[in-house]
Amino acid sequence: MDDGLRDRPGVTSRFFHSLEVKYQYYLDRLTPHTAFRWVIALISLVFFASRIILLQGFYIVAYAVGIYYLNLFLLFLTPSIDPALEFEDEDDGPVLPSKTNDEFRPFMRRLPEFKFWHSFMKATLIAITCTFFEFFDVPVFWPILVMYFFILTFLTLKRQIMHMIKYRYIPFTVGKPRMAGKEDTGKVVVG
């Protein structure tokens, strides 16, 4: 047998590889356009919500995707290195004194914004797809799910805010910090 024939990828693997390359190309093109990406995400979310309202069903799918959105949002708000674990590790023994509490450290997210958007979109598209299949429409009393979702959201966000207050970090930045020069403190004397 010819070994060169076995080493060539099959037709299906070449097809899926070309799809993967095209998908990554379009993701790379969308990366710098944050506002546009989130507008697309909100439009898809409104479409999903309108399907839930018009069909008057698939409440379990909506609840599951809502819990997933909450989990993604919490990962987005959480720092990549948990300060609670840092403070627990400091009890290992005597160390030289340092002043690391006042030191500036940039906020690094556990889930970056692009991955947050990408996971959000995948979950929304999967949820929209689930609404086309009848076996995902499990009969359930939806007010209980709504109440439980709001209680769960309130408790988890309260815990996250308390964590942010305790370890003094802010996960949101408005923009790039700008350097300012010294302010003029006196008059110019012309002599």
UniProtKB/Swiss-Prot annotation:
Keywords: Membrane, Protein transport, Transmembrane, Transmembrane helix, Transport. GO terms for cellular component: endoplasmic reticulum; Golgi membrane. The keyword Transmembrane applies. Pfam families: Rer1. InterPro entries: Rer1 (IPR004932). The chain crosses the membrane at residues 35-55, 57-77, 135-155. GO terms for biological process: IRE1-mediated unfolded protein response; protein retention in ER lumen; protein transport; retrograde vesicle-mediated transport, Golgi to endoplasmic reticulum. Its main location: membrane. It is a multi-pass membrane protein. It is found in: Membrane. Belongs to the RER1 family. May be involved in protein transport along the secretory pathway. This is Protein RER1 homolog. It comes from Caenorhabditis elegans.
